[in-house]
């Protein structure tokens, strides 16, 4: 019996996706005008919770006109936000409240309201209200608007990217036929070539399997150099960030950004990076030596020699490591068809957290007037609590296929709050609506969408963001989100479930068992391989395979942490220069390539006489553009926290519904209503420790409690 009945939206109307380019602009201008009026009268809360919803289309809509209009709306919001939070009159009123710390006005505030006022005060200060001289405040505001426009332009360039590389037929050796069949045939002088897009679903399997080193290098360099127009924009962004931080009285941008986060200082970040880099360095050196040995052996079998491993070799030789692992990898994706995997994952989450995800079909969507999805392939879910009283928790959207448009968003994109949650004036809750957009290759009539292990892990990770956003319940919309250096922890914790044998097996399901059409697709692939009357594949992975898979990620973990250390190190170097003059003299491209080589102990084009500017990978570093500036270390800190949370709550029994509900209530539900360090210590019962993380790096999960994380309190 369906405990929920047929009503999807009895509790709250979901958002509508019926915008037009003109309506977006009108809605944005109306929202800004209403907000300004509210501030002018100071009689109501700031109603900006729809801002993310209106800019949602810029990275999801198949309509270029709507994407462009949404980008323009983003500029309107950016400028309006700067104007609002640089208003001295409102700042003076907020400041007055905090100056009365021991008086009645503050005493009447609950803890969440006081915390909100404190964060609001810091936001005003960081938007120029702390600058005494009027002329400098005007300068600051102008530069902040310019900075916002530059970031939006870089993102637009990335979203509209159509870059790729032409590959001749002789360069395709090793690349899977399933990928080759999807590539566009050239004409004219490229009539005997195929176009390989640089977007991840195409370039990743190509560079992982191409046998020719020259081909791998071409693909890698095309990826690194696809955003040449962003080179000067990125430089101006870095310089403007530094300049505006100094106008506010900070030593640099990193000092400004960390002041309002868990780590509080760049020095604390640098200490964390140093500890992790020291721990991972010997493991990385061993990893590189193992891969180089594989390259040498392969070269010897071809009658050539190889003395060095390059960046474009890493994915290829990592995939070649170990014949047993290689055999597993070649067929493992057949057990992770996209839609089936997603459904099974949601089922695990339903059990663990006491919830129900009800897919809303076309008939169900007719219950509400208007467009409830932005594309016909989008899936919509109403989310309910079923552990106790039935309770509507909000609406989720899932778009997992490659978007039907030329521009390409990143491989995954969580729009965490198309609508943020908050408490209405009558005490009722306005519930969040969230969206997950995954840029997987779309299925065809002859081939389903099958996920690699990395893609399945990524799916678990992004759904972790979705749950955190969806289940947070705060009094104020502004406190819905957590600090940037905590935001990755809940998602990374959820990843750990996929490396537990039971969950890998539960999620696995060979696509030939889904339905007869899928079975025919699978049989067709065997005909191509000259197999006749093959035995049926088992429906689920065997215990032996699952056992190996649960332990096969150690080398990938090391390379993954190297990537995070590199990006976090580069992020801090550009945002914490020795001086303004040093930053102005800095070659950001050269620094990017030198830092990467130093961290990985692997070289790129500079080893072949191409100099240190052979690739400008900093221009495709999306995170540093989008709210992770001077905050990329959050991925490492998030992993540290995630391992500690997993060990404390789920290590002994990952299927415990009691543990899941405790986690949902103490972490997900809390959101940003209190200091994130308090959330961590309340849940753990102790200060966070790096020991579970370091043990994970070493491939062990036992030992003493280890040192605590060097986070100021």
UniProtKB/Swiss-Prot annotation:
BP term (GO), one: proteolysis
Ligand binding (Zn(2+)): 461, 465, 468
Keyword Ribosomal protein: no
Keywords (A to Z) from UniProt: Hydrolase, Metal-binding, Metalloprotease, Protease, Virulence, Zinc
Top EC class for this record: hydrolase
GO CC entries: mitochondrial intermembrane space
Pathway: Mycotoxin biosynthesis
A GO MF term: metal ion binding
Domain of life: Eukaryota
InterPro entries per the UniProt record, alphabetical: MetalloPept_cat_dom_sf, Neurolysin/TOP_dom2, Neurolysin/TOP_N, Pept_M3A_M3B, Pept_M3A_M3B_dom
CDD domains: M3A_TOP
Record-stated family: Belongs to the peptidase M3 family.
Protein name, UniProt field: Oligopeptidase PhomG
Lineage: Eukaryota, Fungi, Dikarya, Ascomycota, Pezizomycotina
């Amino acid at each position: 019996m369906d405990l929920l009945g047929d009503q999807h939206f009895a509790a709250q109307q979901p958002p509508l996706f019926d915008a037009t380019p003109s309506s977006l602009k009108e809605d944005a201008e109306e929202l800004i005008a209403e907000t300004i009026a509210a501030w002018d009268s100071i009689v109501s809360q700031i109603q900006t919770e729809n801002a993310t919803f209106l800019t949602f289309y810029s990275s999801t809509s198949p309509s270029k006109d709507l994407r462009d209009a949404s980008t323009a709306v983003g500029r309107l919001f950016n400028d309006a936000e700067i104007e609002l939070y640089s208003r001295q009159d409102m700042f003076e009123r907020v400041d007055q409240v905090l100056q009365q710390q021991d008086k009645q006005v503050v005493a009447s505030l609950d803890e969440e309201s006081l915390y909100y006022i404190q964060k609001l005060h810091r936001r005003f200060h960081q938007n120029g209200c702390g600058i005494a001289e009027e002329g400098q405040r005007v300068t600051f505001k102008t530069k902040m608007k310019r900075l916002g426009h530059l970031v939006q332009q870089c993102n637009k360039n990335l979203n509209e990217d159509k870059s790729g590389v032409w590959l001749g037929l002789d360069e395709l050796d090793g690349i899977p036929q399933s990928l080759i069949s999807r590539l566009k045939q050239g004409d004219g002088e490229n009539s005997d070539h195929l176009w390989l897009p640089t977007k991840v679903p195409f370039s990743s399997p190509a560079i992982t399997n191409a046998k020719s080193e020259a081909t791998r290098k071409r693909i890698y360099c095309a990826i690194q150099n696809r955003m040449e127009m962003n080179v000067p924009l990125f430089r101006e962004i870095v310089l403007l960030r530094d300049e505006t931080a100094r106008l506010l009285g900070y030593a640099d941008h990193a000092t400004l950004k960390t002041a309002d986060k868990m780590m509080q200082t760049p020095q604390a970040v640098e200490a964390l990076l140093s500890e992790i880099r020291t721990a991972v360095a010997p493991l990385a050196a061993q990893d590189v030596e193992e891969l180089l040995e594989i390259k040498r052996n392969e070269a010897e079998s071809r009658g050539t020699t190889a003395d060095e491993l390059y960046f474009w070799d890493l994915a290829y030789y990592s995939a070649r490591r170990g014949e047993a692992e290689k055999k597993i990898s070649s067929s493992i994706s057949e057990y992770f068809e996209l839609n089936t995997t997603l459904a099974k994952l949601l089922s695990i989450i339903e059990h663990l957290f006491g919830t129900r995800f009800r897919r809303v079909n076309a008939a169900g969507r007719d219950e509400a007037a208007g467009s409830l999805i932005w594309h016909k392939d989008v899936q919509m879910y109403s989310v309910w609590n079923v552990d106790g009283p039935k309770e509507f928790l909000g609406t989720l959207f899932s778009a997992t296929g490659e978007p039907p448009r030329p521009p390409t968003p990143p491989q995954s994109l969580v729009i965490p709050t198309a609508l943020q949650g908050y408490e209405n004036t009558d005490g009722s809750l306005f519930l969040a609506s969230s969206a997950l957009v995954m840029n997987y290759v779309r299925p065809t009539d002859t081939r389903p969408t099958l996920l690699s292990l990395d893609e399945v892990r990524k799916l678990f990770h992004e759904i972790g963001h979705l749950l955190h956003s969806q289940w947070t319940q705060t009094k104020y919309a502004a406190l819905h989100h957590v600090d940037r250096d905590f935001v990755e922890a809940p998602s990374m914790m959820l990843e750990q479930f996929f490396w537990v044998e039971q969950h890998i097996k539960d999620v696995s399901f060979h696509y030939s068992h889904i339905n007869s059409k899928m079975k025919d697709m699978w049989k067709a692939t065997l005909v191509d391989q000259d197999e006749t009357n093959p035995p049926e594949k088992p429906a689920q992975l065997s215990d032996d395979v699952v056992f190996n898979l649960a332990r096969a990620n150690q080398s990938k973990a090391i390379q993954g942490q190297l990537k995070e250390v590199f990006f976090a190190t580069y992020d801090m170097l550009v945002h914490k220069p020795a001086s303004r003059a040093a930053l102005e003299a800095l070659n950001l491209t050269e620094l990017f390539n030198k830092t990467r080589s130093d961290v990985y102990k692997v070289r790129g084009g500079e080893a072949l006489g191409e100099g240190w500017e052979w690739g400008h990978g900093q221009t495709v570093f999306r995170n540093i553009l989008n709210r992770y500036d001077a905050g990329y270390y959050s991925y490492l800190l998030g992993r540290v926290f995630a391992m500690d949370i997993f060990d404390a709550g789920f290590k002994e029994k990952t299927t415990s519904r009691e543990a899941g509900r405790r986690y949902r209530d103490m972490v997900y539900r809390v959101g940003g209503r209190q200091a994130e360090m308090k959330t961590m210590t309340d849940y753990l019962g102790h200060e966070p420790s790096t020991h579970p993380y370091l043990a994970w790096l070493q491939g062990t999960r036992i030992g003493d409690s280890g040192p605590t994380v060097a986070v100021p309190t």
